[in-house]
Amino acid sequence: MAMTDPLGDMLTRIRNGQQAKKDSVLSPASKLRANVLEVLQREGYIRGYSEDASGKHAALRIELKYFEGEPAIKHVARVSKPGRRIYSGSKELPTVRNGLGITIVSTPKGVLSDNEARTQNVGGEVLAEVF
């Protein structure tokens, strides 16, 4: 059966892994997923990620981050879904928790956080929000 929302699946794996206090989780690899993980790592929400080719298909091993036993990611949600795409200009990008969280945006300049997109004055598809 085909997966309709691969990015949503990865975010759910991260959420479930942190609830289960896992050190790392595996997710099938794709360029979009790797770019989103790059933003999460840059912003300090995960320790890192690496490509894991031990199985039949390429996968991404996501190293989850905890602070004093609590997950670094309190909330992660998909915003733009396959059934309803959400786009935003650079000036209308949503802020998460008054700037305490980030919005991940797919722009013509790549996948960026909301702050980076505002700085570069580009808008795009609002992929997810994290705090």
From Swiss-Prot:
Pfam families: Ribosomal_S8. The keyword Phosphoprotein does not apply. The keyword Electron transport does not apply. Belongs to the universal ribosomal protein uS8 family. It comes from Erythrobacter litoralis (strain HTCC2594). Part of the 30S ribosomal subunit. Contacts proteins S5 and S12. One of its GO terms (cellular component) is ribosome. Keywords: Ribonucleoprotein, Ribosomal protein, RNA-binding, rRNA-binding. GO terms for molecular function: rRNA binding; structural constituent of ribosome. GO terms for biological process: translation. One of the primary rRNA binding proteins, it binds directly to 16S rRNA central domain where it helps coordinate assembly of the platform of the 30S subunit. This is Small ribosomal subunit protein uS8. The gene is rpsH.
